[in-house]
């Protein structure tokens, strides 16, 4: 059997089948995404612009490793980064543990590959974990959980692990109190960890929940003083913010992203990045490492 080709030549059926198989194989190979521009984002911090500058040596190296331009998606909230990744506006970035779990539940294409191994810094212990802490202003009458009944509590963001999930789901059970909105007179969202701490320092809130490493960043930035606060409660260890990518990217791009972060400690510029983010290295992580967050959601 034969058929007429566009070039005007006859081809055998076998030749035609071989060509069709080649087309199918090529289509399969192209089913992954290979964007000319890679977009990076991260959940908002006390100073997202400054924190982005910390990532510059890493992103510069990634440009060399991929041959692609990299753009930054400026976040407005935790949820905005999640939605940007789900909508393919962002290809890789840094989420919070809770926002990662939310993103993963909406799409299996969101894949965690690493996190920070933090250096010891004040109340932040060394390792790839942190704790949620409940803070009040030292010298105030709020020196126990019982004394906070009927007061104003500041959280960070509904999609923040330490500023939303743990206070709402974990803390009431651990402290044996009613839900937050029943125990406190008012629950407010500060929008960022530093703003939650500052709201307590400036008497705009009576207490706040904040991540231990974010609290120390606020202290180190000179915005508040560690000695000005009581720590009334702290959670068990929770894994640090996950580095994620969309696994629909082509393998060479995914490998370049992962390798760039995992070898960041091998260069002088990378060492400066680690110093800025108060970390000793970047360590691999997997989805199951965040099951503790999923379990908290069930409470």
What label would you give each PLM region?
Residues 2-15:
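Bacterial N-terminal signal peptides that target proteins for export
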Residues 25-31:
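Boundary at the C-terminal end of the N-terminal hydrophobic targeting segment
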Residues 32-40, 46-57, 63, 238, ...:
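An extracytoplasmic/periplasmic, membrane-proximal ligand-sensing/linker region
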Residues 35, 39-65, 75, 98, ...:
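Bilobed "Venus flytrap"/periplasmic-binding protein-like clamshell domains
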Residues 83-147:
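Acidic, polar ligand-binding/catalytic clefts
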Residues 85-86, 148, 200-201, 243:
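Hydrophobic residues within well-ordered alpha-helices
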Residues 94-108, 167-173, 199-202, 206-226:
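A ligand-binding cleft/hinge motif common to bilobed small-molecule-binding domains
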Residues 110-127, 185, 219-237:
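Short beta-strand->loop
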